[in-house]
Amino acid sequence: GIVWGTVAILVLLAFGMGFKKELTKTFHGLGEHIVIMWPGQTTKPYAGFGIGRPVTFTEADAEMIIRQVPDVTAISQEYIRWNTPVRYEENITSPAITGIIPIYGEIRNVIPEQNGRFINDLDIDYRRRVAILGDEVKTFLFGEADAVGKIVQVGNVPFTVIGVMIKKKQDSSYSSRDKDRI
């Protein structure tokens, strides 16, 4: 009985530790210590304004938060668009397309494969049409071929692929998983 009791405790501890480790790894896929905010509309009247007023965010709002909230170390705006076809040769898909800034990759743990890179400040300054592909979007569009340096059509606009995200575990998302985004 003592042997079986000891074995049962060890098995339960091993299961619990393995579950904790796997859960931590999958939460890491979304990002660590992050807060995600969405625009919306008001639910209460205020100062003569009615219910249902749109509340939107601007880049100035992000700059104000980073200045006034000392525990916030980084902010990335994110603009998401759905239902825009993305094409490479005869392959077409409609992933979530996310407009971001360079710090986004660090915040959300979006790491490019070794032969590519992430968006940088020069891309923003020069308004370059560059894209990072989620690993499953890359596989759908290019198969096993290298995607970096190739041109994909986003709608009717050409974008140069500068990186492909390394595969990661991500069990939660707020619009789509990173593997299915551009």
Predicted segments, located by residue:
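Mid-to-C-terminal secondary-structure elements
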Residues: 98, 102-118, 128-182
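Short, solvent-exposed loop/helix junctions and linker helices
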Residues: 6, 13, 55-59, 127
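Short, strongly hydrophobic transmembrane alpha-helices
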Residues: 1-21
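Residues at or immediately flanking beta-strands
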Residues: 1-3, 10, 34-36, 74-76, ...
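Hydrophobic, regular-secondary-structure patches
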Residues: 17-96, 103-107, 121-122, 139-140
